Amino acid sequence: MNYWHSAIATFGIGDTVTTIIGLSMAGIYEANPAANTILGELGLFGIIAAKVLYFGLMYIIVKSMPEHSRKYGPITITVLGTLICLWNIAIIATQVLGF
């Protein structure tokens, strides 16, 4: 099984899409200082470039690990991406529902 697909789907695409949706709504801002700086300086292109760079770096690191351990890199990214997506969705839902 290629664990990178789920990592890209959650952290790469899911986080990016939910962030874009959230930031398009009044009252929602980027809480991550690094991402906020990148967004302010380079916009959406900067976020996508940072994610591509991050995935490239993680891929190199994972490839240098023993083969039996390689799946844990993308699995960790998938868990992180899932949690971030759920957080973003909760923030968006809170704004939409007026909580």
UniProtKB/Swiss-Prot annotation:
Keywords: Host membrane, Membrane, Transmembrane, Transmembrane helix. InterPro entries: DUF5658 (IPR043717). Pfam families: DUF5658. It is a multi-pass membrane protein. The chain crosses the membrane at residues 8-28, 42-62, 73-93. GO terms for cellular component: host cell membrane; membrane. It comes from the Viruses. It is found in: Host membrane. This is Putative transmembrane protein ORF13. It comes from His1 virus (isolate Australia/Victoria) (His1V).
